[in-house]
Amino acid sequence: MRPAPALRMGEALLLKAPVQTMAKSLIEAIGYKLGWKAAQAKNAFDLMGGTDEESLRAEMRLGRDMAAALAERTPLVEENETTRFAVQIVRWLAAHVKEKKLPFSVLVTAEREPNALALPGGPIFVSWPLLEMCQGERDEIAFVIGHEIAHIVLRHTLDRIVKDAALSLLLRKSSGKLAASSWLNQAGRQVLSHAFSRDDEFDADTFAEALVRRAGGDPLAGESLLEKLAQLSAGHGMSIAGDYFATHPSLKERIANLRAKRPR
């Protein structure tokens, strides 16, 4: 395994700190700009209006509120060598993402199934079993995290969330964190866990591989991980990866996509 870049003292788990305050409520930061037409929107950025800077700030506030609400109801792994390693990898990859203003961060959850979740603006949740599947291989973990970074950068998650009519209604009535918490209790979890389109998933894989390459890692690590999981699944005669991989295209299709789009 290649050594990961050093992490400065005190930076280990920045996302562990709860989000206590926001500069403005989401109803000001996003709701006013959206005009509450989210259900009819074709694109999240068509809704936000204003400048790119204002849209980005609104996106980050939305993600922070959702991350805080989700962290309160999700079991988290206490800080240890693996969680610190995950944070190192996020910081390492973030340095090579072209969109520098997004504050990517990660929390490791104690869920029993492999799972990962990307929220608007930068927060990422990754489950302990999903990290274990990578067997400590930095570049395989980087591919998994890079895949989630792609959903953020390409606005896959944001488009889905902003178009949800239930969230827009809650944001009209409540401040950001309260609205996010209520939404997660209702339709939010289903919206977040619903499968992305095949094209979105293929694009996220391609993005992740390119990001690992740009960061100086092994660009074939993602394919190696997918092949390993495919072999394990075949050996068990069933999926060993739970719902997380079930919501993606098949492992064989993902491998074929990476090979087809890889620079010659």
Predicted regions and their residues:
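A Zn2+-metalloprotease active-site environment signal
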Residues: R2, G10-R264
